[in-house]
Amino acid sequence: MTSEAPGPSLILGSLRSEDGRGVVRVQHRYDTDIDDLWAAITDPARLAGWYAQVDGDLRPGGAIHIYVRADDWEGTGRVEACESPRRLLVTTRESDESWQKGQGMPPYDATIEATLAADGGHTELVIEVKGVPLEAVAFYGVGWQIHAEDLDAYLTGRERADSEARWNDLLPAYQALAAAIG
């Protein structure tokens, strides 16, 4: 089941249930070419500018360590596919220690897939996160939308929006989306 909600805020994402787990899908068209966007999502120095500190082996099969300062999230992952400049697939392991020093959920595995498509001088990016606990899917939707917006700000040289204010603005709409997939 898929749900998309209208609202006063632009909602880039949708939520659905698949095999009893949540799926977050965020889609946005960026004002840059595919090679620049690919570099922004795969180059550790550029990732740090909008998303997270990522260390490790960023080739297929490589183990990575991810630290998202804004969310106080830390975890590990593995690069499953890296098909420049079109597709990146990473698996992550969430544990009770991943979030805010043990305040998280029981361990689970998730996949994050980014697909890029050139559209003239622009690029369409779709991020799909699978394996999220249904009780947390709204929060992941908000988080990934904020990450997509932060990427846009980074690429255009604008200042990022206040994450806490943005979170509070987006959460009701994503909670409505989550309730609809129930």
Question: Would you name each region that the model predicts?
Answer:
Residues 35-38, 149:
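Amphipathic alpha-helical segments that line or abut small-molecule/effector binding pockets
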Residues 42-43, 84, 153-156:
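Residues at helix-coil transition
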Residues 1-5, 131-182:
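A conserved amphipathic terminal alpha-helix motif
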Residues 19, 23, 91-155:
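Beta-strand/loop substructures that line and gate deep hydrophobic ligand-binding cavities in soluble
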